[in-house]
Amino acid sequence: MKKKTNNKGTANLRQTQGPQTRNIILAILTGGLLTAAWPIWGIAPFIFIAFVPLLLLEGFVAEGERGRMFWLSFLAFFVWNVATTWWVWNATPAATLAWLLNALFMATVFWLFHLTKKKVCNNPWGNFILIPYWMAFELLTYHWAIKWPWLNLGHVFSSQVSWVQWYEYTGVAGGTLWVLIVNILIANILQFFKTKKAKPILINIGLEAIILLLPIIISTRVYKHYEDQGTDTEVIVVQQNCDPWNEQFDNHFYDQVIQNNINLSLPLVTPNTRFIVSSESAIQEGIWLHETEKAKALKTLHDYVSRFSQLSFVIGGTTYEWVPKGMEDDFPARHIDGTDKYYYCHNSALLISGDGLQHRNKSQLTPVVEAIPEWMGFLRNFSLTVGIARGTLKGDPESKVMTFDGHKVAVPICYESAFGEYVGSFCAKGADLIFVITNDGWWGDTPGYKQHFEFSKLRAIENRRCIARSANTGRSGFFNQRGDVLQQTKYWEPDAIKATLKANKEVTFYAKNGDYLSRIAVYVTFVLLITWIAKSFLDLGKNRKATKTTTRKKR
């Protein structure tokens, strides 16, 4: 006897599998397009369609399938995070926690957008709710415990600086806003085609053309006519090329590193040279801030610059200081075994001149590697050594400029150059030049050091400042005020280069006001969340009332 085949069940299974496959493909497509748009692949136009598959997917997922939307968006963002920042593994496997957490945070943002849209404005116009949610999230990436602004959408245009000269007014948040609006309008056009309503289709097409093209047209015109402002200042950049894994932190190489800096820069020094800029963490002998006169490296460099009139040396190093009494419970404080003493460790930038020593400590510390959140304090018991970092460093509470020969200079250290508002705060305090010092050799010959180099282009535009960038083994160079690369070195080659940069004292709108667009987005997000919660409670009350009415009628 033949068993009956459940044709209806088989058909339902096929119907379910079809949409599931489609949704997974759309999620992966968004991750792939975001990756293809990102520096250093540099196909920036892909960013304008990257969110479209995910927005279409969101329209397919019903309100009752909330969990499915979360995991599909997580898939999209996990693909993007891993494919774009896989090189983090080269520095420390622990830092790959950023892949997982950042994808989870992004998925949570998209999931909240999905829930709010379904409840507040469940049609294509509701897609605009994503904008304040995403921009508020990007603001958080600069400020919460695990800071990771590397993938903030506005950074994508570092490969197309002629398109975003207006960053001097908006910062990268303006780029994020631009990207999201264009993606949403394209998604809306496709979704309105299903309704066959001509008016909304034409409105979206018109808006799309204006919003996509007008910023490019205006920016290209500004780019064509902009000229660097300020006074001429001669700067030398040194790429010492000391292997951070095998040499730089070995005490047998301490003196050689300093001598390499002198030997590389000396042939380029002229009476007009004002600054020599070298890399992050180049001095490793251990400088105690209360007795800097005992540091051999500082004395050697002081003697070097004193041979010339009006010459200074900017370089990175590890510094230490005692923890003040009563501050022993401060999380970054480190205990000296067998004593009652505690000390702080800093990743510092030092300016050495005939007038003495100035320093600032890195504030925006690299998550896990340099800064362990207190809730992850258990990691302090493990050796997470990457260069100078083991456990948590102590940073300055705010930016600090250093002065020399009438100049105020900003010296962002490594990761800090990814923080637009923070770099702008130096310029708001009068910095007329920016010197980025970094040690990108941890990542090897990967997209990591190349992406990091690209971000300096955007910092130059945001602040209209020339930038000198020294990378130990990555890529060093000079940038003008419109984000062009004036000179650059080759990877893993010792070198020194020289340029005359314009020191500009004019403060841009963005440097004065910071990420104001993202702060506005936070307020809008708050209103939308309150509206969603209130409407959810109202609908819940209506449903309960309707259920009771139905029950009474049945009785």
Residue ranges and their predicted role:
Residues 132, 275, 281-283, 291-315, ...:
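CN hydrolase (nitrilase-like) catalytic-core segments centered on the catalytic cysteine
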Residues 544-555:
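Cytoplasmic C-terminal tails of single-pass
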Residues 383-413, 504-545:
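Cysteine/selenocysteine-centered motifs that mediate thiol-based redox chemistry or coordinate metal-sulfur cofactors
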Residues 220-367, 401-405, 411, 415:
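Soluble catalytic regions of membrane-associated enzymes that act on cell-envelope
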Residues 2-226, 445, 456, 471, ...:
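Membrane-embedded alpha-helical bundles of multi-pass enzymes
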Residues 211-270, 439-452, 457-464, 468-469, ...:
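Non-cytosolic juxtamembrane linkers/loops
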Residues 88-91, 140-172, 299, 334-420, ...:
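Active-site catalytic loop in hydrolytic enzyme cores
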